[in-house]
Every structure is written in C-alpha cells, then in structure tokens.
C-alpha cells in the first residue's frame, strides 16, 4: 500500500500488462516502478481443464503503487487453474495524478474500465461512501458475505471505512492500528524498565499521563517525540466526529486540542520540532537529532518500511506498546467496479482475487504470506500487520528491530481499538490546512483564535465548505 508517502519521487504512469516478476517481499512505496510509461507481458495463468482452454478473463487492475499488482504473481502461482490475466495500470498519487485518472476511467466505462481499483486512507471514503461510491460493487453482490468478514475477524475500523449504508464496498489486506514505538534504553534510564506493560501505563491512557512522561524524559535530557506530527495522527483518528457535520466544517474538541498540545510540546522542549517525512525526523529514528527522542506513534508499516531503513545503530533498541489513545494511520482498500457483475466469469474471477487478498485466512491466503513475510518462496520478507485477527493470532510477529518482541501482541488490540467513523472524503486537503495553521500558532506567528479563523477561511476558499 501507499502509506502516505506524499514525497513520492516520480509520477508513475504504467498503463501496462504486468509481467510475471514477483516482488522481493511485502514491498512498500513505489519500488520497481518506472517514471515513464512501459508495457510488458500479461500476468496470467492457463486453464488446465478441457481440451480447448476457455478465453481468459481479463481483469483491469488500477493501483497507485506496484504493491497490489505484485500480489497477482503470487495469486497466480497459488491458483494454477485460474483462467485469468491481469492488465495493470499504476499511477502514483504524486501531484494528485491518481484520482482524476481513476475517476475518468470509471466514468468512461467500457472494456478498459477498472475492474478492481485501490484507494488509500487519505481518499478512500470518496470511493466507498462519497462522490464516487456509486461505481463500487457491494461485496455481497460478489458473494463476499458478512459471515466471511466475521469469520476472518477483520478489524472493524476497516469495515466501517469500506461500508456505505450497511453495504460493504471495500476492504483492506493490511491493518494499520497504531502503537507507541519507543527506545528501550531511554525507557530503562527514565522509568527503570523497558517492559511494554509498564511503559503503556507511564505514557497513558490519556494525554495528561503522556505529558507527565514527557516531563520525566525531559529531566533526563530526552524528547518524548520528534515533532508535533507524531501526536497528530492519534489525535486525528481518535476524535469523536470528522471534519464535516451536516455538510459543514466542524472542529472536534479533540482536534482543536491539538493546538494546545502542540504548543505545549514546543514551549517545553519536549520534541525536536521536526516535521514528519523530513531528514530531521528520520535522524531522530537513529538517535542523531539534537536531543535523543523516546518514541514515535505509528502502525507496523512505520516500523517495517520507514524506521527499518533509518534506525541504524538503534536497531534492536525499540519496543512497541499501547498508545495513550487508539488510532489508525494509513491503509489501502480494494474495490470492485459494479459492472463486473454483468459478466459471470469476470464477476467470479474478481471475487476470487479480492477474497484471496482480503478474507482468506488459510496458509495460502495473501494475509498469511503478508503477516509472516513469506510472499517470495525461500526468502524471509517483511512481516506486517494484517486485517484478519485470525491470521495475526497464528502468525509470528517477532522482528529484530524490536529486540525480538512479537509486535502482533500489541497490534491485534491496536487494530481493534481503532475507529473508522471519523473520516471524510476531504481529510487529505483539510488536514494539510489545519496542520499549517497549527504550526503558525505554535511558532508565534498568529494567535490561537486567528489560526482557527484562517483555517476556516482557507477551507472555504479552497474547498467551498462553510463552517458551522
């Protein structure tokens, strides 16, 4: 999935037929993608039944990274009788390129229209519940039932985000419930232990305890987080309601509190005042910032795909525990075009692939490979948190970066504690405006009231959304 890597390096326009190349692991981001259009051979499987093979079903798959397209290779390897080929289009979200292209393709319809398409957390509600939701098939119409969801014990927040009026339209394969990821050595020096069960009670529940811990860490010369962006995601996704109520801009009290908590971090020197996705933020993962930083908030993907390449000498000096408040961050959902139901063969093929990715809890299901890092035969890939608690409960989440801790012991409850009922289809744009104004306030460039007023005005000017 694309995990909110907004600094993607290139626009990927790969209106291509995926070649059978297989990913090295559960890869993230835009690895292996070209910055210019390229075309290859079909990713397909021949039917072994009958003397005259039936014409293959072509599935048009749209995505914004090569992650889901790479899954088709594993699917075909584990389904040798699948009479299907995948025609893949990958367009990066850089500069907002993916959504307009997807919207146009869905509206145009026809044989080249997307049959399966991906949407990430930043804009999935547009396709599952919002303006573009009418294009999406109900999972039930594909034979993917609520009982299957229950049997797989899919994280409820993922179901809520993918549902409209009680009808499931999208599911993810990954679960992105968040934890607090902290330095063991700093925990021992400050709190006398690095035990996750003890640390969770030092930093929470609630922000009051978190800031009590920040004061203790500061006395030892440590910051509790790298920047205010580190607390934004748990604040944003633990709010009671989203940015819109009855079509008008609403500032949930928990989100408004971000102004005060951000200022408290800055005024007390509790962080290094970095911005996420910058070199200074990465430096704090390796312990090379201006003061050692205790921790970061994030899902398993932050550990696997971001910190793993940045921790350097601090590798193994990390652990995960429950955060002060439940939240999720990121994720990718799969949707099917409702028009696939018009062709029984295509409907069956699309349903089988989506089931394998999102609901199959067997040893040959995508989520089992994903959780255990076994996507590529004979190689240990990256272990990751998945949507099915059934799969997580029987998988081994021990990783070296966490000193051998089984991260699934923390991420299973983290996924259960996340809420998917506070999102809107405008979150990506509104969040940028909000965080800009919070930084203006904490930097002393404007008053709290002015920051809120300017936030409301920019939302009106840029999105034509009035305030309550």
Question: At which residue positions do the language-model features occur?
Answer:
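Helix-loop-helix "hinge/cap" segment bordering the ligand-binding cleft or interdomain interface
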Residues: 147-149, 159-231, 243-276, 338-343, ...
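C-terminal capping/gating helix-and-loop segments adjacent to ligand/active sites or protein-protein/ligand interfaces
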Residues: 396-463
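Short, well-ordered beta-strand elements
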Residues: 53-66, 84-90, 116
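Extracytoplasmic "Venus flytrap"/periplasmic binding protein-like
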Residues: 80-154, 189-190, 287-295
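Extracytoplasmic ligand-binding clamshell segments of periplasmic binding protein
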Residues: 97-99, 227, 237-323
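Hinge/lid segment of periplasmic solute-binding proteins
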Residues: 119-179, 208, 317-319, 401
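Extracytoplasmic/periplasmic substrate-recognition and gating elements
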Residues: 107, 310-381, 436
């Amino acid at each position: 999935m694309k995990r909110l890597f907004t600094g993607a390096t290139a626009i990927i326009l790969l209106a291509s037929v995926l070649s059978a190349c297989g990913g090295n692991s559960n890869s993230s981001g835009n690895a292996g993608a070209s910055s210019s259009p390229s075309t290859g051979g079909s990713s397909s499987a021949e039917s072994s039944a009958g003397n005259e093979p039936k014409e293959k079903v072509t599935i048009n798959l749209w995505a914004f990274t090569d992650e889901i397209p790479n899954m088709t290779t594993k699917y075909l390897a584990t389904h040798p009788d699948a009479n299907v080929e995948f025609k893949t289009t990958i367009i990066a979200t850089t500069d907002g390129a993916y959504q307009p292209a997807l919207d146009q393709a869905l509206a145009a319809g026809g044989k080249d229209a997307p049959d399966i398409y991906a949407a990430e957390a930043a804009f999935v509600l547009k396709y599952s519940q919002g303006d573009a939701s009418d294009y999406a098939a109900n999972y039930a119409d594909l034979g993917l039932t609520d009982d299957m969801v229950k049997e797989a014990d899919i994280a409820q927040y993922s179901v809520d985000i993918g549902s409209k009026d009680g009808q499931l339209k999208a599911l993810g394969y990954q679960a992105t419930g968040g934890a607090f990821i902290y330095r063991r050595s700093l925990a021992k020096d400050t709190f006398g232990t690095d035990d996750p069960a003890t640390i969770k009670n030092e930093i929470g529940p609630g922000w009051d305890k978190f800031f009590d811990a920040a004061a203790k860490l500061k006395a030892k010369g440590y910051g509790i987080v790298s920047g205010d962006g580190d607390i934004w995601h748990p604040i944003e996704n633990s709010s009671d309601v989203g940015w819109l109520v009855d079509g008008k801009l609403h500032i949930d009290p928990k989100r408004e509190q971000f102004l005060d908590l951000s200022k408290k971090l800055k005024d007390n020197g509790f962080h290094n005042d970095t911005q996420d996705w910058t070199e200074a933020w990465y430096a704090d993962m390796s312990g090379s910032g201006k003061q050692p930083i205790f921790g970061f908030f994030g899902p398993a993907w932050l550990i696997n795909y971001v910190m793993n390449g940045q921790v350097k000498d601090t590798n193994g000096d990390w652990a995960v525990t429950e955060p002060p408040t439940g939240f999720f961050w990121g994720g990718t959902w799969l949707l099917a075009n409702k028009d696939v139901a018009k062709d029984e063969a295509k409907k069956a093929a699309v349903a089988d692939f989506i089931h394998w990715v999102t609901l199959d809890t067997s040893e040959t299901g995508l989520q089992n490979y994903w959780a255990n890092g076994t996507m590529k035969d004979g190689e240990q890939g990256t272990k990751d948190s998945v949507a099915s608690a059934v799969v997580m409960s029987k998988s081994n989440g021990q990783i070296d970066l966490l000193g051998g801790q089984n991260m699934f012991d923390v991420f299973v409850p983290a996924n259960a504690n996340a809420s998917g009922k506070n999102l809107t289809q405008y979150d990506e744009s509104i969040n940028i405006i909000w965080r800009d104004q919070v930084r203006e306030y904490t930097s002393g460039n404007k008053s709290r009231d002015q920051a809120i007023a300017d936030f409301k005005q920019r939302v009106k000017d840029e999105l034509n959304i009035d305030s309550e």
